[in-house]
Amino acid sequence: MMLDIKKTRGFHKIPQASKLQSTTKTSSVVATSASSQNEVPSPGGSAGSKVGATNPVRAANQRFFLVSSYKDPTFLKAECDLAHAHVTTSKVKTTLQPHRRSRAGEDSRNNNYNTSRAPTLINMRRPSLFNGNQQPTTTNSTTINNTTSRNTTSNTSNGVLKYSVRSTTATATSTSTRNYGKLKPLNNNQTTAGVAMMNGHTNNNNNNTRNSSNINNGGNNNMQRQQQQHDDISFIDSDDPPATGGPEAGISTTKTSICYFKPITPPLQLRHEQNQVQQQEEQPQPSSSKSASHRYPRPKSTIIASAHSNFAASFEKFSGGLYRQTNGETNIESKTSSNARRYGIDSLSIKASIEKFNNLSGQKRQNPGSGSGIGPGSATASGLGGGRLSVASRSNHGSQAGGSSSNLQQRYSSDLDNIRVAAGYSSSLTRAAYRTTATMNSVSTPVAVTSELGGPISGDGGETATAMGQPTSKVTVRGAHSNRQPIECDSVVLTNKASKDATTAATPTVATATATHTPATSSVSTVTVTAAAPNSASDSTLARSGTGSSSTARSVLPPMTPTSSRYWDRDSGTSRSSIGTSSALNSSSLKHNSDDGYKTASSSRDEKSEGLCGLRNIGNTCFMNSVIQCLSHTQELTRFLRSHHGSRSLSTKDQQILHEFAKLIQEMWTANVHTVTPMELKRAFSTKHRMYSDYNQQDAQEFLRFFLDSLHSALNSGVKGETLNIDDNLSDNKKADLTWEWYTRHENSLVRDLFVGQLKSTLKCTTCGNTSVTFDPFWDLSVPLPSSSRCKLEACLDLFIREEVLDGDEMPTCAKCKTRRKCTKSFTIQRFPKYLVIHLKRFSETRWSKLSNIVEFPTSDSELNMGSYGANSNSNVHYSLYAISNHMGSTAGGHYVALCKHPVSRKWHEFNDNIVSDALSENHLVSSSAYILFYERT
C-alpha cells in the first residue's frame, strides 16, 4: 500500500511498508514470527503477544524524518534544537536487579559504559556528521558488574547502520540476542543516516523494561535522535504499551524495531518523577510485573530548550537546587538516578513570567516618591566626592548581548535571566545587537546622592536608586561615550535661548521636596535641596543637605537592549542628576517664549523632566519609537496634541490614530512619567496600515510618511472637487502662489502647515529649449549621498538640486515638439516648511547594502542656511537642528534610536527605546548612523 504525500513538498517517494518487516531468528528453538509485515514480535518468542499493525502515517513520517537532504542546521535553533528519537524495543526479563546509575549529567555519552572505561570514553572527542550526529566506527566491549554487554556497530554499503547486542548473565541459563532495527534513509547518495549519541546534546534514556519509567536501568540504552529541519515538523508520539515477554527463557530472539520521536520531558514531569522516586524509596519496591503497568502520560506539546544554553541554572531554580552540575556529573542529594537534564519550559512557567511582567509594569503607575523599603534584592548607591557619582547597576549578562527584543520569558522572568539564545537564531521579538562590547554591558540606574547626614536624598529632586536582580556593581556615569572622561555632575545653569536679543539669567532659589513612604514603613521623610546657580555654569557648585531617613524607588524593569553605562533607566522613577541639580532654578527662567504649551503656573512642576520619557519596545518597534520621539520634540505639534481631546469611538481609522497619538504625547509630557508603552498607538496604526500589523523590522522614514499622512487626514478640513486652472503666461512666482493656495484649500490641517513645503521642478527640452515648470508639495527631502566617505550636508543638497539628464526610457514628451525628447530636470525649493525633514538615502536602490558615509550636518542654532537652494536665491532661510533618527546596523537588521533637544532645557538626550541618556554634547551628534534630520525654521 503506497502512502500519498504532497508532491509539491518535494518528498521522496515512500517505499512499500514491507521494507520494515520483522524477522525472527532463534539459536535452539525457532520462535513464531509475526504474520503481518508491520508487526513487531515480542521478546518472549512464540509465547509473546503481538502488538498489531503499525500506524502507516507514523511509519511514513519515520522514514521521512531520516532524509538527510532536509537537515537544515538553522531550523528552529532557538526554540527546538532537535527532536529526540527513541528506539522502541522490548527487553528480556532478567533475574538480576538492574544496576542503577545516574546518567543525568552525561551529555553525548554512551550510557552503556560503566566505571571501568567511562573516564576514557567520556573525554574522547568523536567526529560528527554535517548535521551533528555521531558516526561510530569502532567495536567496544564493556563489563558492567555481573552483566557483560557487547556493542557492535557496522556500516553497510547502502548507508544502513546495524546494532547487534549480545547480553549474558551469570545466573541466567538462556541467551538473548537482539538485532536493532534498520533505519533506511530515503536518499540516493548512499549517505549514512545519523546514528545515536548526537554530539553536544543530552541523551534521553529509553529503558523499555518492566520497571517504572522514572528508574534508569544499567542495561542497554541505545538511542537514536535526529535533528528536525522542516517547518511542518510534528512529533510522532506513541502511547502503545511495550510488548511483554513470554515465560519461555531458553529462546534467543532477534527482532527489528522502529524509531519514533518523542518530545522532551518538561519540568512538571520531572517534579512528578521526583515524587515517584521518593515514594518508591519510602515504600517497598513492587514487583516488576506491577511496575511495568504504570506509564506516565507524556505531554503532547512542549517547548524544547537547547542543552547548550544556560538553561541549567534556571533548571536548578525549578528543582530547588536538587540537581546541581559538577564536572559533567549531576549530584542528587540522597536520590537515585533520574533524567535531570531532560528539562524544558512548561506553559506554567511562561504564564508566571507574563504575570510577573504585568505586575512589574503595573508598578510604574505608583508615585515615585512612595516606594517600599530596601529589600534583600535591592541596593542603594551613594554619591562620591568631587561631583562624581557612583550608581548601582544591574549586570547585563551576555544573554542580552544578542539584541534587544527577545521573548517575554527572556526579558522579564527573573527565573529565566540566564537564558542564552544561540547567536544568529533570534525570535520574532529579537533585534540586532546595539553597541555590545565586553566592557559596556551594564545598564546604570539613576544615582543615589548621599547627604551630609548619611541618608540618601529623596523627593522630586531625589537621587535614590534601587537595583533589582542578581549581581550589582558600581560604575561611573560617563558622557556620550563610555571611553571618555567622566562628566562632573555639577549644577547646570540653563540659558533661555528663545530670544536672540537677550538671555535670561537664572536666580538662586531653594526647592523643597517631600517624599512619603508606603504605609508599611509609616514614616515621612522631608528633604530640602538647595542649588546655587552662579553666573558661570563651569564654576557652579551644588550644596546639598538632607534630613530624615531614606526612601527607595520601585523596582526597575530590565532594559530591552544592551546599553552602555552612560544610560540611566527611566523606569526607576527618579530624576537625573542634571535635572535634580538644576531643580532650584526659578520656574520663570525655564519658560520658553515661543512655546506657551510648556509653561506652567506651578513652581513645583519640573518642566525640564517632562518629555524625558522612554518608549518600551513591544517587538521590533524601535523604528516607531525613534520617529515618535522626534515628533514629540516638535514643539508646535506637541503643544497642539497636549491640548487635544477627542473620543476613542471615532468614525475613521485616521482619527483613531490621532486620538491614540495625542494620549501618548500627553502621557509622555506628564511629570513623573518616565516610560510609556505605545501598544494602543501601534494597534490603531496597524488597523489602517496592515504591513505594520506584525512585528517585523520596518524603515523609519517610510513609517514617518505614513504616520504624518494619517495625522493630516484626521485633521484635514479641506474641500475637494475644485480643479486648478493656471495661465501659462503668468510668472513662476505667481504660478507657485496660485498652486499653493489651491493645495491649501484641499489639504488644510495643522500637520500640513508644519511639515509641507513646495518644490519647483523645471523640465527643459534639449532640442527646442522649451521649459516646463511644475510646483509640487513635499513632506521631506530625500537627498542622495556622494561617493566620498565623509561629506557635508550641503554636498548632499547640491546633488539633490543638480540638473539631471532624462534620456532613454525616461525621456518625457515635449509639449512643443509633441514627441518624446531628451530633457534636463532640476529641483529648487519654492516654499520652505516650518519644520524641514531631511532624509539621508543610506539604503541604495541598486545595491543591497547600507551607505555608511559620515555626513557632517549643522547642529547649532540657525546654522543651516537653505537660502541657496531656494527658487529665490537672494533670501536667507535659517534652520536649527532639534532631532535626529539614527540607524545602527545594516540592511539585514539594525536598531533605531533618537537624539532630541529638550525644548525647555535645550539639552540633547538620546532615546534608546525605554532608556533615556544624560545630557549629551553637540560634538556627539554627527555620526555615520544619522538617517533622518529634523530642523526647525528660526
Curated annotation (Swiss-Prot):
Biological processes annotated in GO: innate immune response; negative regulation of antimicrobial peptide production; negative regulation of calcium ion transport; negative regulation of peptidoglycan recognition protein signaling pathway; positive regulation of eclosion; positive regulation of proteasomal protein catabolic process; protein deubiquitination; proteolysis
Consequence of gene loss (knockout): RNAi-mediated knockdown is pupal lethal. Pharate adults removed from their pupal cases display severe defects in head eversion, with head structures forming within the thoracic area. Pupal lethality can be rescued by supplementing their diet with CaCl2. RNAi-mediated knockdown in the fat body results in the activation of the Imd and Toll signaling pathways under unchallenged conditions, with constitutive expression of the Toll (Drs, IM1) and Imd (DptA, Def, Atta) antimicrobial peptides. Flies infected with E.coli display enhanced expression of Atta and DptA compared to controls.
Domain of life: Eukaryota
Polar residues bias (residue ranges): 392-410
Active site positions, chain numbering: C622, H895
PANTHER family according to UniProt: UBIQUITIN CARBOXYL-TERMINAL HYDROLASE (PTHR21646), UBIQUITIN CARBOXYL-TERMINAL HYDROLASE USP2 (PTHR21646:SF23)
Protein task: Hydrolase that deubiquitinates polyubiquitinated target proteins. Required for preventing the activation of the Toll signaling cascades under unchallenged conditions. Essential for bodily calcium homeostasis.
Protein name per Swiss-Prot or TrEMBL: Ubiquitin carboxyl-terminal hydrolase Usp2
Lineage: Eukaryota, Metazoa, Ecdysozoa, Arthropoda, Hexapoda
